[in-house]
From Swiss-Prot:
EC numbers for this chain: 2.2.1.2
Name listed for the protein in its UniProt record: Transaldolase
Source species: Rhizobium rhizogenes (strain K84 / ATCC BAA-868) (Agrobacterium radiobacter)
UniProt keyword terms in alphabetical order: Cytoplasm, Pentose shunt, Schiff base, Transferase
GO molecular function, one term: transaldolase activity
Amino acid sequence: MTSKLDQLRAMTTVVADTGDIEAVARLKPVDCTTNPTIVLKALGTPMFADAIKEAVAWGKKQGGTPDAVAAAVADRLAISVGAALSGLVPGRVSTEVDADLSFDTEASLAKARAIIAAYKERGIERDRILIKLASTWEGIRAAEVLQKEGIDCNLTLLFSKAQAVACADAKVFLISPFVGRILDWYKKSTGKDYTPEEDPGVLSVREIYNYYKANDIKTIVMGASFRSAAEVEALAGCDRLTISPNLLDELAKDEGKLERKLSPENKTSVAKIIVDEKTYRWQMNEDAMATEKLAEGIRAFAKDLGTLRAMVSKELQLAAA
């Protein structure tokens, strides 16, 4: 009997949600996703000690305020992590635009273009990279422009159908609807436990997947943020799933039968809707879970980005001493 992970690979593109180089080499995913939390964790390992030294040495030669230099070095380190991952996977690596730019379309565009240019300097072309943007209205507008420039985007922190429809209207390459964080909110809100078939996060991704397939929307659906292997199994057949190494290992050790849950052939008819800015903002306002989790996610990523920049500032000060 083949493992559930191998069975999953036969119906879904498996992506690793990690910056752990050893885990990626061992698990052999098609793509990798990163975020500020993952980058910070990766840089804490011995594998990136030389990259930190190189980036700090580079930073010492740059002009600008100490904060600006620290931010530039932090960006360089995020690219270092992404470049290392890119050498291990045949597909794409997702690199995130600064969370503190989530409500600034023009600044997000500038940062996204800078990320693509930084990868190109290392010989990595744009077709190997996905630019991650928060699924705010401003982030979606930035993605719409980038897509027209040939820069593919991954819209993250997505918790609602309104966000998913707005992303589809913008013709983004890929969305990352979150599963586990939705479950977290409902468990805290209701005090209930949920089976995988009742899991609000699972049901949200299934609804979005069906809407996309029913309306022939080409945007890829990549379920993200899993709390258990059971959640992953409940979305078997989704276009892509980005999964942490510990859950990938769990699936690799399980030789039970994996049932396909999602398939384009099983779509049910649903009317196409248009989500303009006022509709997006109203529907988000009416969805307490989506509003709270989007804001919480942006704050968490911004905090980790701040931690990374503080670490860089300390290294720069030590190097200058």
